[in-house]
Amino acid sequence: MLSPRKTKFRKQHRGRMRGKATRGNTLSFGDYGLQALEPSWITSRQIEAGRRAMTRYVRRGGKIWIRIFPDKPVTMRPAETRMGSGKGAPEYWVAVVKPGRIMYEMNGVPESTAREAMRLAAFKMPIKTKFVARPKEES
């Protein structure tokens, strides 16, 4: 599971997810990618599940990049606890994903393989996504 090694503060405000992604919205490393179409928090478990689904499908071939990192702690209080007495303890980590953000990238495999691998990863995500490919250079 992905999580930061250390952070400046243990707890964070929840914040708001307004607008589209201005960074990380273009393919940087691979030729194919999985792009988010909705805003959401993606947990480190969901990121890992998507990565596993893709690696299992492509097996030895291809390289996969994970373009999102869970750097936001989500706190939870113990069950059946009375209100008050401060904020809960950090329970898990999430990545804040806005529409347009590229979540995974892939290279070194045919488009059909990449498309199917991304489809399997998309099933693990709590949001709608789309497959994006780098435009082909014509010689």
From Swiss-Prot:
The keyword RNA-binding applies. Residues 1-23 are annotated as: Disordered. Pfam families: Ribosomal_L16. It comes from the Bacteria. InterPro entries: Ribosomal_uL16, Ribosomal_uL16_bact-type, Ribosomal_uL16_CS, Ribosomal_uL16_dom, Ribosomal_uL16_sf. Keywords: Ribonucleoprotein, Ribosomal protein, RNA-binding, rRNA-binding, tRNA-binding. GO terms for biological process: translation. Residues 1-21 have a biased composition (Basic residues). GO terms for cellular component: ribonucleoprotein complex; ribosome. Part of the 50S ribosomal subunit. Belongs to the universal ribosomal protein uL16 family. Binds 23S rRNA and is also seen to make contacts with the A and possibly P site tRNAs. This is Large ribosomal subunit protein uL16. The gene is rplP.
